[in-house]
Amino acid sequence: MNQESFEFVVYMIHACANKWNRLPSFVYRKLAESGCIQKFIVPNYEILQSLTSDVIVGDIEDYLKERNVTF
């Protein structure tokens, strides 16, 4: 993971935390445990960075729902 994608992951963790009213540490654990960071956010960084954070948070929610991750 390069510096740009790392910063993007941190930004998206905070965006999800704000929308879900959760602590960023909680969101990080859920995203890491589900593989969302390494299998979805980082590989799709180039595409995702051009979308709004609301759209990306929705995509992350869909990713987690498909894997039966609750939060």
Predicted feature locations:
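C-terminal alpha-helical interaction appendages
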Residues: M1-F71
